[in-house]
Amino acid sequence: MTEKFNLQDRFLNMLRTGKIEVKVYLVNGFQTKGIIRSFDSYTILLESENQQNLIYKHAISTIMPSSFVRLVKKEEEEQEGQTESATNKTQ
């Protein structure tokens, strides 16, 4: 059985493991920045300058990483390209 692709978890995990600084914009207009130390289904633990913030996901509007994050590995991109071209040929 193939693994289900969870975009949110993969994105947050890449930010966490890469220790990539992010800006987090909240729905109330507040913004903060730091490094994601952990996350679960409902919260994100953000660390900045020896301070920790536990932010509820429902309060987040946008997460902007300071650098580009590649979510799909090269092999997966090539496999998807082959699947798409095969699908286009049959149509």
Curated annotation (Swiss-Prot):
GO terms for cellular component: cytosol. It comes from the Bacteria. GO terms for molecular function: RNA binding. Residues 9-69 form the Sm domain. InterPro entries: Hfq (IPR005001), LSM_dom_sf (IPR010920), Sm (IPR047575). One of its GO terms (biological process) is regulation of RNA stability. Keywords: RNA-binding, Stress response. RNA chaperone that binds small regulatory RNA (sRNAs) and mRNAs to facilitate mRNA translational regulation in response to envelope stress, environmental stress and changes in metabolite concentrations. Also binds with high specificity to tRNAs. Belongs to the Hfq family. Homohexamer. This is RNA-binding protein Hfq. It comes from Pseudothermotoga lettingae (strain ATCC BAA-301 / DSM 14385 / NBRC 107922 / TMO) (Thermotoga lettingae).
